Amino acid sequence: MFDDCLIMAGGSGTRLWPASSSRLPKQFLPAAEKVSFFSMALERALALTGADGRVIIIAGKSHIPHVIADAAKLSAVEKKRLLVIGEPAAKNTAPAIACAVSLSLLRGRERNMLVLTSDHIIKPLKVFKEDAGLAAASAGGGKLAVFGIPPAHPETGYGYIETGNAAGGVYNVSAFHEKPDLQTAKKYAANRHFFWNSGMFAFNAGFMEEQFRLLAPQVYLPFEKLKKPSPEDFPSCRGVKVLSAWRGLEGAYRKTTGISFDYAIVEKCEKTVMIRANFDWIDIGNWEEYVKIRSKGGSEVFSVSAEGCYVDSDIPVALAGVEDLIVIIRSGKNGGPPSALITRRGQTQKVREIVEQIKDRGRKDLL
């Protein structure tokens, strides 16, 4: 279906602090049983690329061990289809996609590419593959396809896509809208022409090169000058190829402009269409939502008259006479400073404010 699939596995992910941090971002946390969000993205990527297809994974250099740990669980045949690239610096999503496009072009301009996020739950896979088929057809027809999610409720944390006419599940895009305030989000959610922007895309490599040159040359041109990687640039780590010494990559990242793919390309492209998602899409954006998919935390808990509490701790915890608490504790024994979060159910969105307070006090080491 797709020749190349890019999984964007960067980002620090502090919405699930302190379990998620710059050292262990959300995508590497367990989403179900012992399977991480990233592992689920790997499964999707492998299912949507052919036997000769390639899965490109771009993550921060410090997160490569987490990528390898999950990828090592795959079969030998599946691992051969992976290529891991460590970003020298965090420059947002446009440079990551530009880097992947430049790499894909080395194999041909007609290669269809799929861009996936690494921290969402998407199911069932069969339905996602059907929707991705529409995206692949649109990409093959010289379009940039973005997956739009029908809003389940008013949401202020996502950008919105406003659509026009539709044909066979493919919608014309009228406009993109920034993350709204609550009143505006309510209006969007009540309007059948508005969808959440999923951050997942499909396009043809040659077409996207043209769009970068036209709309964001300052992002793409530094990657254009990269030479074709040589065999010694691909050392294997536990059976997975890691492009760790691609000559010129660090220089390209120094010269490129840090900007999101949405701002640089998607919102300016005149050939953007939207694929309406028929699959379930869950963005675990706070502890309240995470607790719903995790029956219990990995903790030794002692409790007396404690009801409706969730504990995720690497040290024993005792609860007495409390209810509806979410308790997250990291002792620091597995790396990073000790930290703890205690919040009441229904108040977990305030973790954002806690994170900002930590930054304001100069304690970014906690994040």
Task: Describe each model-derived feature in a short phrase.
Residues K79-A167, A202-F203, E210-A216:
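Conserved beta-loop-beta/alpha segment of the NTase-like Rossmann-fold superfamily
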Residues A59, L116, F203, G285, ...:
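A conserved hydrophobic position in a structured secondary element of the catalytic/binding core
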Residues E43, A47, A72, A76, ...:
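Generic secondary-structure signature for well-ordered alpha-helical cores
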Residues F207-L367:
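Left-handed beta-helix
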Residues T163-F195, L243:
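A short, charged helix-loop
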Residues M1-I7, R15-P25, P30-T117, K123, ...:
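Conserved N-terminal catalytic core of the sugar/cofactor nucleotidyltransferase
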